[in-house]
Amino acid sequence: METSMPEYYEVFGEFRGVLMDKRFTKYWEDVEMFLARPDDLVIATYPKSGTTWISEVVYMIYKEGDVEKCKEDAIFNRIPYLECRNEDLINGIKQLKEKESPRIVKTHLPPKLLPASFWEKNCKMIYLCRNAKDVAVSYYYFLLMITSYPNPKSFSEFVEKFMQGQVPYGSWYDHVKAWWEKSKNSRVLFMFYEDMKEDIRREVVKLIEFLERKPSAELVDRIIQHTSFQEMKNNPSTNYTMMPEEMMNQKVSPFMRKGIIGDWKNHFPEALRERFDEHYKQQMKDCTVKFRMEL
């Protein structure tokens, strides 16, 4: 594991207590000074928690169920990724500045790193979370296919880093707890991936109502149909196949991999699971938010 450390920390660095991609923090002033608009909607998640799924659901709500409008461009252009920056290749801030209102903003930032302007303008926010074990599995495969990131080595080694918060965007525990605290504000809707898998209709209606639209049976049906895992996996505008292969090698692992709950059982050996569970209990002992590891 030691041999991977220098390479790993050339790409990622501690930034205000959170491990971040150094390319993102290089121009941090642009993020910090970002000017929100009152009708901006923020979709926040810890990575690999269902970001693309909930983003497409929300976009469908905004477009009143018009599937063709949702297919006009890749989701990473329709809903820019706020802090994402790779010199001039990708610039989430620039994309957002050029967008007409109302904008939908994707971020993986914890609340303390989110531009203050979003709080000052009292923007609505949606936070989607997913159980830690499934996030760890999905994150591992994701890091394998991002060509500019160091190989995460074995799954067990990656889980050790995950538990210590030494993965991009830092500690899952801190991230979830901080957003849970923020959800005391009625402008922040806290949602669970597991709830969406259990009853997507109920959760879509919840989103429509939060966004102050009128839920019709027809609209809900269209959204459910268009945003099913299989539909999105086959849809070039959501499956990230429009992303160049030199950035994302989907031959290593597809961006849309399984989209299920409980896949962690296929990856965690017994001893690792026990260590993870003990660590999880310690980290989450003072937090009232409860997760389901299986349905």
Swiss-Prot record:
The reactions it catalyses are: estrone + 3'-phosphoadenylyl sulfate = estrone 3-sulfate + adenosine 3',5'-bisphosphate + H(+); 17beta-estradiol + 3'-phosphoadenylyl sulfate = 17beta-estradiol 3-sulfate + adenosine 3',5'-bisphosphate + H(+); (24S)-hydroxycholesterol + 3'-phosphoadenylyl sulfate = (24S)-hydroxycholesterol 3-sulfate + adenosine 3',5'-bisphosphate + H(+); 3beta-hydroxyandrost-5-en-17-one + 3'-phosphoadenylyl sulfate = dehydroepiandrosterone 3-sulfate + adenosine 3',5'-bisphosphate + H(+)
Q: SUPFAM superfamilies given for it? A: P-loop containing nucleoside triphosphate hydrolases
Q: Which domain of life is it from?
A: Eukaryota
Activity regulation info: Inhibited by estradiol.
Q: Impact of altering residue 48 to M?
A: Loss of estrogen sulfotransferase activity
What Pfam families does the database record attribute to this sequence? Answer: Sulfotransfer_1 (PF00685)
List the subcellular locations: Cytoplasm, Cytosol
Q: What is the recorded phenotype of mutating residue 108 to K/L/S/R?
A: Loss of estrogen sulfotransferase activity
Q: Where is the active site?
A: 108 (proton acceptor)
Q: Assign the protein's first listed, main location to one coarse class.
A: cytoplasm
The first-level EC class reads transferase
Q: Which GO terms describe its cellular component?
A: cytoplasm; cytosol
Give the GO biological process terms. estrogen metabolic process; female pregnancy; sulfation
The residues that hold 3'-phosphoadenylyl sulfate are 48-53, 130, 138, 193, 227-232, 257-259
Q: Which amino acids does the record list as binding substrate?
A: 106-108
Known tissue expression = Testis and at very low level in the placenta.
Q: Give the molecular function GO annotations.
A: estrone sulfotransferase activity; steroid binding; steroid sulfotransferase activity; sulfotransferase activity
Protein keywords: Cytoplasm, Lipid metabolism, Lipid-binding, Phosphoprotein, Steroid-binding, Transferase
Q: Impact of changing residue 48 to R on the protein?
A: Reduced estrogen sulfotransferase activity
Q: What intrachain disulfides are recorded?
A: none
Where Phosphoserine occurs, residue numbers?
Answer: 156
Any further remark recorded for this protein: Abnormal high expression in liver in obese and diabetogenic C57BL/KSJ-DB/DB strain mice. Female > male. Normal level in liver.
* Family from the record: Belongs to the sulfotransferase 1 family.
Q: Relate the protein's function as given in its record.
A: Sulfotransferase that utilizes 3'-phospho-5'-adenylyl sulfate (PAPS) as sulfonate donor to catalyze the sulfate conjugation of estradiol and estrone. Is a key enzyme in estrogen homeostasis, the sulfation of estrogens leads to their inactivation. Also sulfates dehydroepiandrosterone, pregnenolone, (24S)-hydroxycholesterol and xenobiotic compounds like ethinylestradiol, equalenin, diethyl stilbesterol and 1-naphthol at significantly lower efficiency. Does not sulfonate cortisol, testosterone and dopamine. May play a role in gut microbiota-host metabolic interaction.
Return the protein name: Sulfotransferase 1E1
Q: Which organism is it from?
A: Mus musculus
